[in-house]
Amino acid sequence: MAAALVSVSASAQQKVFFYSPNPGGGLRMAVLENDAWNDLGRLCSSDYGTWGAEKKMIHPSLCRANDGTWRLVFQLNDRSPLFGASFSRDLVTWRPQDYPRVSGPKCLNPVVVPAGNAFHVYYQTADGATRRIGADTEFRHFIGDEAVKADAKMWQRDTVNIKGEQMIGQIFSITDAELQHVRDDFRLQGEKWAPTNERMHDDTQKLSIPSVVNATLTVSPNQEKTISDKLIGIFFEDISYAADGGLYAELVQNRDFEYTSKDHRGWNATTAWHSSKPIEIATEHPLHPNNPHYALIWPDTLWNEGWDGIVVEKGKKYIFSMFVLAGGQKQNFLIQLVGQNGQVLAQSKLKTHASDWQQFSTVLKAKASDEKGRLVIIPQKAAHVGIDMVSLFPQETFMGRKNGLRKDLAQVIADLHPKFVRFPGGCMSHGQGLENIYHWNHTVGPLESRKPDFNIWNYHQTRGLGFFEYFQFCEDIGAEPLPVLAAGVPCQNSANNAEGIGGQQGGIPMADMPAYVEEICNLIEWANGDPATNEWAKMRAEAGHPKPFNLKYLGLGNEDIISTVFEERYEMICKAVRERYPDIKICGTVGPFHSPSADYTEGWDFTKKHPNLQYMVDEHY
């Protein structure tokens, strides 16, 4: 395509103007017609960082290479040490943006200029100095960052009037053919999106149907198609309390006292817990390093509100358990389920005696029902006692599994007869920033040793519904597990970290990628390995499943922007998995939006260039 652009360079030229009307307006294009500038539409927009606070394109700067292709840079905000960079062959299709990092704390007013077959990006610092970074021909890799002196003319812009408003940008000349190509694309996109602008007000006219409709139906039985027996599956995403408070049968909220403001604004270790006196939280002698907070209680009533209340059903049994730290003292507790009006729905005594953390349990049988019950814990003796991992499960879970799933919800899923189950996300898989990438190995083992985390959807993950429970559920309903893990990058909508870096945050540092690749390979060993020879497989066996789960599929990446940072890490992971486990079928991704998005185009282009990396890809709509 580049050669074609050069070959028509001698044809008639048209003046066009590139500009951004406001930080959220993206890069737009106008054309000079009859001595007036007319806006054609938006060419691309920023995909950096969180929705609302970010996604801004400030001071866009373009240059055209000798081969007719285009390079674009822009400022992201006034606080990040990054700039946006993209590439286009025809002004219509733009490659997914990269966000190179600069040496200082801020990157202001970047401009791009050709430098032979490569490019230079100049930018200004907060103190007014000028620095320069080099970029390769493909505009994918950026090296060096040095202080330079630059002519102020480099930042000069053109000013034009568009419908009475003064706009600042750059004027270029392109050929008639190039301009028509852009016009055609805007027309096609307008036609494609026109149905989304339909209004119910127009339905009476548009949907008018005559009283009699004649139609002919032709059946061609010889043209039947074979339908895949694995076509229909389900996608479990931990969003809107789908796990804790949802499919996972645990009835106690914040059972681990690990809620923090990272989970949700205003939350803390005592959220969902109540007492007549302030609840004391300690960390000096934790149940497990991954679960450092616990409650210290005196003989005062402590109660938990559950998930918008605890649904208690008459005649049903509930298993209560908690870990107790009493320093060798005997301590008895009265455990109750209490209704909205104060009625005791069920109760049982719990006797404890332990010198260190020890788990105790009892069974409660409900004598009445209430949809808004609560769990009450009453110490029977004056003593300072530590408690943690306070749990209440219905005795009846799906398939009777310990630490299992809600019987009603799980049965609905089972009745769909899905052939596969995608888990655990979604945006939760790649997480809110690098620190929040979902690590499967944090979700297996004893519950108290699992590592909780905040959820990108603004709540908490106990990890009680972890990979063991997920694989067990797939086996119970006859579905293939399709676990989805991050491809070395977090969600592109991640907020800025302490350094002001958001979005994909540069991905997991390449120096740390071998360890991350090993983590993914360990999942395959955990699922399919021999407990006699592999430690991860031994962990699976100790959890109650000595036979392999027979994992066949592995998802890598979740609707990521197909940036250079993503492609490099995705390829690294795929090559390692394919080399060590050739029978595992990898499911890749082609971005967050369907055609004609930049990520969809780049994702499919990358997939076709690397056909041996993956067995299939996920198109996100």
Report residues per predicted region:
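Extracellular and organelle-lumenal recognition/adhesion modules and their flexible linkers in secreted
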Residues: T196-T462, E480-L482, N497-A511, Y581-K585
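Carbohydrate-active catalytic/glycan-binding domains of CAZyme proteins
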Residues: S11-S208
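Active-site groove signature of glycoside hydrolases
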Residues: P379-Q380, P394, P424-C427, A487-Q492, ...
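Structural recognition of the beta-strand scaffold that forms the well-ordered cores
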Residues: S61-C63, R71-F74, V111, H120-Y123, ...
